[in-house]
Amino acid sequence: MTQTVNEREDPLNLGGGGWASSIPLRTWPSYHRRQRGAPMSKRRYRDGPKTEYEAPRKQPKQQHIPGPWFQPPRGPYWALYSNWGRCGGPWRPPLVAFQSPLCPAQMIRAYGLHPLCVCCCSCWNGPWNPGWERPPGRKKRWGRRGRGLRRHPRRSFPRNPPIDLSKMLRPVNLYGWRAPGMRAPRNTTQFIMNQVYEDMRQQEKLERQQAALRAHQAQAGGISPGDSTTNDAPQSGAEEDSQLPEDLYGFMQDPSLTFSPAPGQQNQSPTPGLVEEEEKNVDDDECDEEVCDEKEESEEEEVDGESEDEDVDEEEVEEAGNGEEREEDQEEEDVSEEAGLEEGEQREEDKFLPLGMPLSILVGDEEERENFMNYDYLSQEQIIPNVPEADLFMVPDISH
């Protein structure tokens, strides 16, 4: 073929069947329809998508060309004389006719034979397939099948034993599962404040009951002698006089009573003790005069005993003075034991702080509080001493 179909594609008229010809001779493909004026480089399924629009290369790259009869493409140079099969399938050792006897170095290199042992035994641990022999320039990466795979998929268990996490110090899981009723861990500020306020409410309740009990005692001490005969009138007045210092002394000793709730609150919510006492008073009015007289006499004796104990306590306090607080505490305990169970409970309740008390008294220990100056007990002259003005402006001479 001396004439090309398209001169623009083959300007040198190199037509022919050579590998450098612009239009190699081949049979028409089944999908090809020859039209008048259509170029030979019509798009074919093996060529790229731009064959119609681009002129082919002047010297096309050499491909695997079939020879005079079909042969599979040749492998790379390093696999020419290896035992790898060409077309896949199971590996078969090459025919003995094509093998030359291997020297010891080749046997050691190919089959991993130990150089000190040249026998046919189990020490020939190399596989028949020398696939581990790589082309030059390649590196064997021991211990992994592929480049990116770190763990063999066939290995069902890890080589290293699992770490026991229970022996390690784990961080606190603040946002994990909690009990259904808990909004936060038990040691948070909210929980502590709830406890504090609950204690304060309980203390306020106890204090209210205690104040109501004191008021009822004072009321009972003033009313019950009035119901008695006219001969007992001066005695009832004396009991009222003794009850008044007793209440004053209680207020002096326990400042929490000064913050008791208003009487309107007490009247709104009377304690069960008050209700019981009112029922007792109704029963007393209904009972016989003789029984009433006996009860009144017994009550008067108890009140007299309490007032005498309180008078003795007041005298001892006046003699002791302000400096002996420990003795006062002991005397108070003795008096409370003698007064009975109600008075003992009352003293125990007095130990708690009410809501209105300043919390500054809780700051610091007793020893620390003693070191601070209490300005309530100092006069104006002690706080600001009268010093002559000449002494104020004197600068001490420190040169000598």
UniProtKB/Swiss-Prot annotation:
Organismal lineage: Eukaryota, Metazoa, Chordata, Craniata, Vertebrata
Compartments, record wording: Nucleus
Biased composition regions of type Low complexity, renumbered to the chain: 209-220
Gene that encodes it: Ccer1
Chain segments carrying region Disordered: 1-68, 134-164, 203-353
InterPro entries noted in UniProt: CCER1 (IPR027889), Coiled-coil_domain (IPR052696)
Protein's name according to its UniProt entry: Coiled-coil domain-containing glutamate-rich protein 1
Pfam family, one: CCER1
Organism listed in the record: Rattus norvegicus (Rat)
Biased composition (Basic residues): 31-45, 137-157
